[in-house]
């Protein structure tokens, strides 16, 4: 295991590594341990008691964080006709069809964070499944990125909408803000995420749902959150 730097070691002294804190306490501590010279991203990591290999135990969705993430996402939209103008007016960074497919395939171009598509464009987008899928960029109705309401979709993403989904180890990783955010802003974003994940609990999930929860800054250590406190 690589040796951690002096700032990291100092950050460890700010809290008890063996203790699990309530969400609000964890937010206070994660701000204290974010000591890098840049504005670190604060992330939540949530391990769930489900098995993502089973279709009936998937946990996926999207929410608009009350205070955004501190980053304005670049949005690419697949649309045609009048929907192109709608997407552009809503603030989409890139709008197109086959031309964007060619650019992504030919140039290995990925200068965007979220992909949105109208349902009638999914045949075109499907050609990019092998490259968008592994990057978590494939549009999906559950996350609101396959829709004819492009104005709403683009504006919500620009306002701080984030998608959450399980990785192969049944963990959700979601940014909830920046170290420069006020504690109350981070706490509210964190609470909004936890409530959404709680509501998304699959009927097939058995036993303890929230297995472990932590928050961390880009360069800082993870702060454990008491799983029994996340729904309070």
From Swiss-Prot:
NCBIfam families reported for this sequence: rplA_bact
Protein name (record): Large ribosomal subunit protein uL1
MF terms (GO), sorted A to Z: rRNA binding; structural constituent of ribosome; tRNA binding
A Pfam match: Ribosomal_L1
Signal sequence segment: none
InterPro entries documented for this protein: Ribosom_uL1_bac-type, Ribosomal_uL1, Ribosomal_uL1-like, Ribosomal_uL1/biogenesis, Ribosomal_uL1_3-a/b-sand, Ribosomal_uL1_CS
Purpose of the protein: Binds directly to 23S rRNA. The L1 stalk is quite mobile in the ribosome, and is involved in E site tRNA release.
A GO BP entry: translation
Assembly, per entry: Part of the 50S ribosomal subunit.
Tree of life domain: Bacteria
The keyword Repressor appears for this protein: yes
The keyword Repressor is annotated on this UniProt entry: yes
Keyword list, A-Z: Repressor, Ribonucleoprotein, Ribosomal protein, RNA-binding, rRNA-binding, Translation regulation, tRNA-binding
Organism field: Alkaliphilus metalliredigens (strain QYMF)
